[in-house]
């Protein structure tokens, strides 16, 4: 197992060289070496040549390589045999729909996955997407142990890729689902291809435009800032009825949170909730006047930056030291999840709620196990990013593969069809008009004063 996943990194590197030719990664088996196995015997067992086996497993090319019991080997398809049979697409009765009804799942139930992302080490985009891809592969391995078979095809699709060449690959038409692309200009051609061939397209990261509304086969995971603000305001108003709201002007000229606080104020006025506005530079006495002594207070800053949060916490410490029993909760921003090493104690102290579409919990047992396996297989830690890209790929693959395995073409990713508890990145889709599916998953991460933590999903 460990050796196999180390090999994946080598394959990602090989993709750089093969991208122009549109070559894909494809394999038929992950094989665990047994005590009496030989290289010749393994090759013969799977009807491949020794050279094909060695080429698929770069570690075997080292002069000091020795086959050992427990090694995991990538078994490629024979060079003369296609990975899967090609089913030619035919026109549908409704030509205007342009969505093929001839795409069929593999007879044995195997879920065929395509990954069309920049899988290279040239820049940060490629490095992040390689990590996402690793997460997809780890999910496939995990699902295999549960009896869910997968075939994975991967294409290196950098920013300047010839997308037409990629989708012309016969293997692309065999996919049940494709994850990608990363870049906006690649969405329409790949989306049109998926629509024509009845393939689901999962767009995992931020793009511009509204392609999801035009393509019923697309799944847009990323939520725009406007969508997230709307969800956050809805959750705020629902949860904090009967509270007094205190909005703190932090004098941050670089902040983009003014859109949130402006719309929050409009909503509060609409529902008749009282609020006060104070300033971070005000005196302690003036700052205290903004708070209610009879109602619980909810404090909202108009910036997500750490320095202003730190200054606000200092103000709150002074306030609560001289006003015992004052009820205070903090309502923050997703960025605050990056500051947990510094402010966790304060989050608990001030009953903090953080709105987000993901939550990375480094103390969760399943998360620890996946990170440990990642470290063993790839000899490196996951990138220190929020969200973790490998966990994102793991969650996305688990969600969609499980759904396709259980529901087949009836799967659309709604909350009612969810069969997976995520490590970090929950998904919940809703159709956009007559178009595709938009992720609407949203949660509040709540740091409770009793030093426990809960996630509240909406």
Model-derived segments and spans:
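N-terminal signal peptide c-region/cleavage motif recognized by signal peptidases
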Residues: 16-19
